[in-house]
Amino acid sequence: VVLDSALRTGARINARYAADPKALIGSATETADNTFDLFVAIPAPSASSAGSAPGSAALSGPYWAVTLEFPGGVTANARNTQFSLSPAAAGRLADFSVMGHAANIAQGLPQTQQMTGATYTLNADGTGTASFGTAAATQLISGSKNLYVSADGNVVIGGSVTTGSHDFLIAVKAVSGVTNATWNNKFWGAGLRVDPNAVTGYSGSMAAGGAAKVYWTKREKAMGAGVFDFTGINGYSLNADGSGTMELTQVGLGAGGKAFVGSAINRSDTAAYEIFFGVQLPALSGSGVFLSPLGVVNAASSAPPGNPISPGQFITLYGTGLAKSTQTAAPPYPATLNGVTVLVNNKQAPLYFVSPGQINALVPYTTQGTTATIVVQNGSVNSNTVTVPLAATAPGVYSLDQSGSGPGAILHADFGLVNAGRPAAPGETVLIYLTGMGAVAPAVADGTAGGSNPLNKSVADVVVLVAGQPATLLYNGLAPGFPGLYQINVTLPTLLSGGGNLPLAIQTNNAYHDQVDIPIR
């Protein structure tokens, strides 16, 4: 969803809509100015559902709440918190402990603050206020906040309207009996982050598989870096009450596991201040030949919806009724396979694999623009049209287990597999296999393999990082003999301490991909 900003003329919000719980979230990631934002909207309750008295059912906690504040509009006063918000008696909030940090308190180290005597009011339309005592720069949270409760009571948003205040509060109704496996769905996500390197607003999606790690796709707008696409993985650990950690952030899972909030509170990240919010993706289905609007993904990384496609990239399409049966093609890949054709911006895409629920195709090299339309033709029947972002590159490294994470598809120089049984050594040359590196020179025909003399090199510049250290680039282009498969040869950094599975990231001018590891001895 693209929305015109109500606050800035000409700014457009890169937004996402969720149906359960209902919310509209996003950030103005495509604007060229130096304004960075987070947008959250929720449906207001009717008078009959909200009630008119404090303590009504519209605010029935507990809730996991996070805040991001910039008192006076300056980062020197920045503060980030997480706490449990729960109504007690009419008009009173239960006493609670605030976890957080502030730039002007203890050098930004995490602190706790005991909150007693907090009160609230709630009106029939879901609006209200919460008072956390007299406003004070020495407190993690204080003063009065306006509150807005969603129609179903699952989400609360708010902030202060006092002159000079710049803050955001987001809360989700807490759940109980949580384990790591509870976080098992796909979500829209958006956030705002301030750290010494940049100010960043982002909008995207996240997939949690219940196995203590989540996959992120983010379109980010960062000060000094412009707009770029991030795909990566974060580990997490949840407590029984839904609170927990995700890498260097604190999170709270709520709304029956269908929404989450987060804030940057960690001793290892004391200069970062961030707030983010996620809501479950809607369930989409259709009749006949149906291509899921959420089902166009990078064939290597399987990054969540919203990640761009790029010219020459292997993509996977998910839906129903896409083909009458399963069939696989041999190179050069044809434009029609088993009666199925895929059109990308009205141009036929080479097909490797078709089945009723999945298609693997190559994006034509001539695909241009900022978005692309995709249509599946099964015989004489066309699917719905799906529009997806398009970028010069959208790197995704293949993984050994085909999940998009864990040990990557990486070979030693003798073409032996890099794995736990035969890890790579610091300073060794390795071969990395991926897709999504965009245009090559000399060009090749759609669906055909790259050659060996001459090699078809990627036009895009690339940096390979191992545990954050740059590797020495030797080759970046198509893997000879395999359509749509790219290969990057690097010499690993010589100073890789610790060994084990180290993160391997791919950085281009418009993208940063960080989902796989490389075993190092």
What residue ranges belong to the model's regions?
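A sequence-level detector for low-complexity, Ser/Thr- and acidic-rich stretches
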Residues: 62-66, 70-80, 84, 105-106, ...
